[in-house]
Amino acid sequence: MTEATRILLGVNIDHVATLRQARGTRYPDPVKAALDAEEAGADGITVHLREDRRHIQERDVRMLKEVLQTRMNFEMGVTEEMLAFAEEIRPAHSCLVPERREELTTEGGLDVAGQEQRIRDAVRRLAAVGSEVSLFIDPDPRQIEASARVGAPAIELHTGRYADAENPGEQARELQRVREGVALGRSLGLIVNAGHGLHYHNVEPVAAIEGINELNIGHAIVAHALFVGFRQAVAEMKALMLAAAAKR
C-alpha cells in the first residue's frame, strides 16, 4: 500500500450507546464495541458527546481513553463545557461540529467563516493539550479556506448531501463537490477526512478520491452488525474502502 492508496477507517460507536440509552440499561456496551472494532481493523474510534447526552456519556469517553489501542476522535460542540471536558480528557483527535438539540443527527457543517475567532480560540485550546483538531464542514471553498486560516490542521468534509442525493445526477454533482473540496483542502496543507451518511452501497466512490485520509462511519456499521456481528461489519467496510482506494 502506497501513501496515495492509504485510507483509514474511524468507526463511530454512538449508536451502540443509542440502543443502550433507549432502555436505560448497561448494555450494549459501546466500549466493548470499540474494542471489537479495533480488532476488526478500525484505525480509530469516534464518539460524539452531545449536550443532551442522548447516546455517549462522559463515563464512556473516560473508559475509552483508558483502553483504546488506536486513538479516540472526540466530536464536540464548540461550547465551554465541551472544551473544558476535552482539556481534561486530552483525546488524540478532536472534531468540532455544529450541534442543535432538536436535530436527529448532525445536519450540516460548522460555519467556520462566520465565527473565525471563536473557532481559532477553540483550536488553540485543544492543541495546547495535544489534541489534533479537525473541523466538520461542508465541502464549500469558503469554509475550507476559513478552516486553514483559523489554524486547524485537519477538516472533515460533510458527505451528507452526497449520501442523501435522490438521483444519479445529483449524486454525481455532490461527489464532485467533495472531490473539489479534497483538492482545495490538500492544496492549503490540510489533512482531509470525510463522513456522514456513508454506507456499504455508497462508500466506494468517496474512498476512491485521491487525498482523502480517513472516513468516519457509524450508523451503517452498527446497523449491519445486527445481522453479521460487529467485527464482521467493520471488516467488510474496511475491505470496501481499501479496494476503492487501491484504484486511485
Curated annotation (Swiss-Prot):
The active site is at H48, E75, H196. This is Pyridoxine 5'-phosphate synthase. GO terms for cellular component: cytosol. It comes from the Bacteria. The keyword Cytoplasm applies. Pfam families: PdxJ. CDD domains: PNPsynthase. It is found in: Cytoplasm. Transmembrane segments: none annotated. GO terms for molecular function: pyridoxine 5'-phosphate synthase activity. The keyword Hydrolase does not apply. The record marks E156 as: Transition state stabilizer. It comes from Pseudomonas paraeruginosa (strain DSM 24068 / PA7) (Pseudomonas aeruginosa (strain PA7)). Keywords: Cytoplasm, Pyridoxine biosynthesis, Transferase. 3-amino-2-oxopropyl phosphate binds at N12, R23, G197, G218, H219. Pathway: Cofactor biosynthesis; pyridoxine 5'-phosphate biosynthesis; pyridoxine 5'-phosphate from D-erythrose 4-phosphate: step 5/5.
